[in-house]
Amino acid sequence: MPHSSHTQQTKTHEAAAGYSPRLCNDDLAPTRDQNWSWYNIFSFWMSDVHSMGGYVVAASFFTLGLASWQVLLCLLVGICIVQLCANLVAKPSQMAGVPYAVICRQAFGVFGANIPAVIRGLIAFAWYGIQTYLAANALMLVLLKFWPSLASLTSSSFLGLSPLGWLSFATMWLLQAMVFWHGMNAIKRFIDIAGPAVYVVMLALAGWIVYKTGLDGISFTLASKSLSAGEQTWQMITATALVVSYFSGPLLNFGDFSRYGKSMGEIRRGNRWGLPFNFLLFSVVTVVIVSGTQSLFGKMITDPIETVSRVGNDLAVAIGLLTMITATIGINIVANFVSPAFDFSNCAPQKISFRTGGMIAAVGSILLTPWNLFNSPELIHYTLDVLGAFIGPLFGILIADFYLIKRGRVSVDDLFDDTPQGKYWYRNGFNPKAIAALLPSVGLGLIISFIPTLHEVANFSWFIGVFLGATAYRWLARDEREVQAKAAFRSGAVAQ
């Protein structure tokens, strides 16, 4: 069971039998298996960073017209902000041993928590389908390279996908489902291997490129344009904000994983190695590879799949492509599968288990036909920007509630109490103050996202959302904060 001087905890795991069945099942109840070490958290972040999307994003920062030291400074500052936020959001879930959807009951109410849970689940749901499609494309490249005769299966189309495309998508879908179906321990073992495996391939690829081009063929400034001092300053601020925004999704539901941490010390150590150290190393290796492609192939290639496919040795190509596919499976599971599994389970615990919630997302990803979504960037923009406008305010409200209002305390039993006597019952299971803080904060985020003249400001929408959500909730819940402060004074407890 989780243990903390600030956690009013259940006596044993069997006490879950006394929890409301409308709020609890074996997957949502406080876990007894808090056995994740710093390395497991480190591997989680490796799986999140080491992806085709992460590769393209890391390379893009070096095309902004900034000097290499400026880019690295932006990456360092941005990822340190992510590290700080990860430490903050990890604590309540680690203390209580519950996932993100359950800890949200503190701020939104035992039923109101379904609002942030479903929002995060839908975001992950959409990205899960898109990432599976990208992995399927990589698999299709492998198949066509070694069996060119399969090209005949790409000539026709059904619902926007060729027969070979369907075969590849189904294969990736099943592989991910197999890992997920065996539970969190299988996921932990998978990401422990996936992250380091990508490093082996990337370092080998970087070494091959340096061998082919020589050190003179490597440049840490990939842009051809030059910027004024003012433009450089603005680009640096923007780049820093984009780093944080890139991690905003998995950051919000990091509690789904921190709940398994042995201690906050282990989690902080894992975050330190998995974020600043890992992200900077990955970015440097990425830019070595990308800049080398300019010298080696005559054009800059930002797609790792295309770069690997140009290596002369067939065995090396196969290993490289399969590792990239593994990396995509890794990020898809940790960022886009686990989240909806817990989030959808939270909506109807007795009807939807962790497995069922995950399979809802998996089946839904097929019905979404993500290849059609991916081929319509405007539709992706509008769909995900609308959902993304919620992420900043949700994070701000969650953090403000735990640290400023609840003063670092969690009443675990009350997270599963659906009676009016429960601390998190509020008004019929919903906290009107949290909802009132969320709606205008999201509304402003949507305005920023969809007004073209505010395009530059949109890069900071996560920060704006966090500030608005936290500030509005802090003000609306000021009476509760005073009550909590008096209770803490009477008990002699000091919030950390």
Q: Where are these predicted regions, by residue range?
A:
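Transmembrane helix-boundary motif of multi-pass solute transporters/channels
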Residues: G18-F108, G112-I115, F125, G249-P276, ...
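Hydrophobic alpha-helical segments and their helix-loop junctions in multi-pass secondary transporters
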Residues: T132, A136-K145, A197-S224, Y246-F247, ...
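C-terminal membrane-solvent junction of multi-pass transporters and transport-like membrane proteins
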Residues: L394-W475, K486-R490
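Transmembrane alpha-helical segments of multi-pass small-molecule transport proteins
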Residues: L144-W181, P196-L205, M236-F254, F277, ...
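Membrane-interface loop-to-helix entry segments
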Residues: I119, I130-A136, L167-I209, L222, ...
